Amino acid sequence: MSSAITLERILALQAAYIRCIDNNALESWPDFFLDRCLYVVTSAENHKNGFEGGIIYADTKGMLTDRIAALREANVYEKQAYRHILGLPNVTRNDGDSAESETPFMVVRVMHDGKSDIFATGVYLDTYQVAGTDLKFARRLAVCDSSRVDTLMVLPL
């Protein structure tokens, strides 16, 4: 496979990423990221104001792996699942070695009793890089439209 970053490769990465989360294959989730990466879930207001912290903050693949281990082994939470709906990514920069895009998202949370609610809407601000032959996230900021977030965000967006 070519090492070029194309829209087709970005779409394939995003589709596989969402499938991983929506199908509860969370142990594979960190593999979508470089070893040195940034994953943040934040609000649009905090992002606009330049606040770096987030509802979820991880700056290494190891931190992402630890988050899933804690979710599976230590955290106590009501059983739930996500269903993601994505818009098409708008590639805002592509210099060959890395690329950036903005992708709108909506996440529906399905609770164990079958109740479904819109859980989050917003935009992914992504930076991609090629690692070997694979396209990976160097950075994924999930910028939520609302600053109102459930007190326990269990699953990654």
Question: Can you annotate each of these PLM segments?
Answer:
Residues M1-A25, D31-D35:
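Short, low-complexity N-terminal intrinsically disordered segments enriched in polar/charged residues
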Residues I5, E52, S116:
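Conserved aromatic-histidine-acidic binding/catalytic patches
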Residues E8-L11, I55, G62, F119:
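A generic "alpha-helical surface" signal
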Residues Y17, W29, L64, S101, ...:
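Hydrophobic pocket/interface hotspot
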Residues Y17-R19, R72-K79, H112-K115:
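Short helix-to-loop capping/linker segments positioned immediately adjacent to catalytic or ligand/cofactor-binding
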Residues E27-S28, H84:
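A short glycine-rich, hydrophobically flanked beta-strand micro-motif that places a catalytic Asp/Glu
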Residues D35-P104:
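A solvent-exposed, acidic/Ser-Thr-rich amphipathic alpha-helical stretch
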Residues A81-I85, N90-L157:
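A beta-strand edge to alpha-helix "cap/lid" segment located at domain peripheries
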